[in-house]
Amino acid sequence: MNAPLCGIWLWLPLLLTWLTPEVSSSWWYMRATSGSSRVMCDNVPGLVSRQRQLCHRHPDVMRAIGLGVAEWTAECQHQFRQHRWNCNTLDRDHSLFGRVLLRSSRESAFVYAISSAGVVFAITRACSQGELKSCSCDPKKKGTAKDSKGTFDWGGCSDNIDYGIKFARAFVDAKERKGKDARALMNLHNNRAGRKAVKRFLKQECKCHGVSGSCTLRTCWLAMADFRKTGSYLWRKYNGAIQVVMNQDGTGFTVANKRFKKPTKNDLVYFENSPDYCIRDREAGSLGTAGRVCNLTSRGMDSCEVMCCGRGYDTSRVTRMTKCECKFHWCCAVRCQDCLEALDVHTCKAPKNADWTTPT
């Protein structure tokens, strides 16, 4: 056998594992599952044994995770609201996002990161609110400590983010750890980046005690920031995501383009370029942009030129109720009238050969 053919056969097993698609986070479907914990644990498709075990042992945590799915999917949709792919979910699909995440793309990287972050956030918040039997406020934040402003006492309820991260890692990563392929490694990396993003915005809040509000004594606690901060941070990481390829031994990544830096644990990584999401494509999981609202005056991703992929747009005149003629009344209220406002709404045309024009 000649040398080129030898090289092909050496790389074939790695290539096959690299291209094997699998959307593994079927726990996302917990948002749509109701009933008792046993019903939920037994009916969410695709959970591995470790995940079902945790589900049965910690039904209260699973409820928190299920409620959190709606929160992080809403955040995903907010971040992608001006993007051709707008993080749309499919109600009857256990993968929640359909075939679009079969591709190891930037979008997949973001969804795995934001979902992992969402689990940390939901569990940690539930701990602080006393909703979980297995955790409460951070037990390590006790006694006296110092910061740049001086001495303070730990008090209140510090968010127990270490517990949230630990449980999220055990539950979310369980299925990926059973896999040895490149996609599993990619998902694990992005899951970790999502968890780290939540902790990045943990902030110290304090309350002053003393005469006339003087700060002779301070009580402080650690609190998570609003989840929007995590979402916006991961959105920036999405825009700077690093394309990688597998090492020859299949144990890690190297950058696809040697001009770029090696990804850190905070970066998002992906293997495959994204489709353009312009047209409906069942194989790619793209719903296209036909019927999407676009911004005629924008020069960004939401512009009619970019959003509609050069196909043009339709314009319709609509009316909406707005507040007008607002006046300040002493003291202390602003009173407005309800007025009808007419405005033009621009929506992307469908491809000429398309049979589907429903908005996405």
Swiss-Prot record:
InterPro entries: Wnt (IPR005817), Wnt2 (IPR009140), Wnt_C (IPR043158), Wnt_CS (IPR018161). Glycans are attached at N295. Residues 1-25 form the signal peptide. GO terms for cellular component: cytoplasm; extracellular space. Keywords: Developmental protein, Disulfide bond, Extracellular matrix, Glycoprotein, Lipoprotein, Secreted, Signal, Wnt signaling pathway. The keyword Ubl conjugation does not apply. Gene3D superfamilies: 3.30.2460.20. It is found in: Secreted, Extracellular space, Extracellular matrix; Secreted. GO terms for molecular function: cytokine activity; frizzled binding. Palmitoleoylation is required for efficient binding to frizzled receptors. Depalmitoleoylation leads to Wnt signaling pathway inhibition. Belongs to the Wnt family. This is Protein Wnt-2. It comes from Otolemur garnettii (Small-eared galago). The lineage of its organism: Eukaryota, Metazoa, Chordata, Craniata, Vertebrata.
